[in-house]
Amino acid sequence: MKSMIVKDSDFVFVPPPQLAWARRVLIKPCAGYPLPYPVTTSPRLLNAIIRGIRRISNADILIADGTPTGESIYPTYQALGYNFHHVLMLDIRDSIFIEVQNPLTEFYAVESFWVPNVVLRSDFLISVTPFKVSRSSGHFSVANLLSLLPVSKYRKGRSGGWETLYQLGIEKVLADLYFTLPFDLGIIEARQKFLYADDPQKGEVEDYGKILTGEPHEIDLKASKIAGVDCEHLKLINQGRVQLED
């Protein structure tokens, strides 16, 4: 799949040919907080993607995410203006979770993940995220997959989040997750760059005016070059690809 970087004003979502065969398309936005773009994925971009899918397919379209606290995401969807016609809005915490083995025999941190069945039952998977940089690492389409994992299984004590995974080394975990939960397409909403330190809800904003699309690892590499950061999980994914080819 060819990676593309276009001006946001010129962006029209043209789905890859294989999407035409899908009966169920799952879109994973970045929607964990009730704060607008660039903290979360904009409804404008999601609408453009939905329109593009509808032009070539009558597939069921699902939008799914979860909150870092493990609380219901529906009030957050409402706050973000996620109101789409004939699209099923799902809360990851309501899913049935199935343990899926990491295909890497020499995995980095996690041998298997608890994955929502709604992801496994979808035929085409799209990760849609803002352009976020935290200190020296980028949070792009691969890192966006973390909130598909159940807080109930990965929290530590009573606090929310995925603390047990962070303790294993989140960059290694993200590389393992990429192989265990392979997404077909990454879309990075880089109309603005969002730069933050510790709190993903507070940061600085820079205008950039682009939309990036492509295979998640490939497009994240392009985004990391634009941001001038080295993402360890993207390097580990490169090494993992070599392992799978051997």
Regions found by a protein language model. Give the residues of each.
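N-terminal and secondary-structure boundary signal
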Residues: 1-246
